[in-house]
Amino acid sequence: ELARQIGLSAPATADRVRRLEAQGVIAAFTVELDPRALGYTLQAIVRVKPLPGQLHLVEELLRRIPEFVECDKVTGDDCFICRLYLRTIEHLDDILSKVTERAETSTAIVKSTPVPRRLPPLVEDEHAHR
């Protein structure tokens, strides 16, 4: 399928993929699951600001809670911006209760995702438009 999409033969495509893997450009092949199909009908973005002296403990806590599917350490007033997949608002409350003992949180419920996670522009494409 990939070969057809990029207009190369299957062997040429396989060779290119192997080279990109060897160069570290392709880091992994993944499967994308639909969280809704697994019962996770709610998404939340949670900003987390650890209480004084709690930074490392909060970071470890966020790693251990599987509903935190991604979390970035950021600059600014908060230390972390995290995405959670949840089943209900009560589920959100249960998860946040584990965090609020050691951090302040600010939560936003995701209504929609107009720009889903995507790759940055490829270098070759960027030069082609100049």
Please name every model-derived segment.
Residues 1-130:
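A compositional/biophysical signature of low hydrophobicity enriched in polar/charged and small residues
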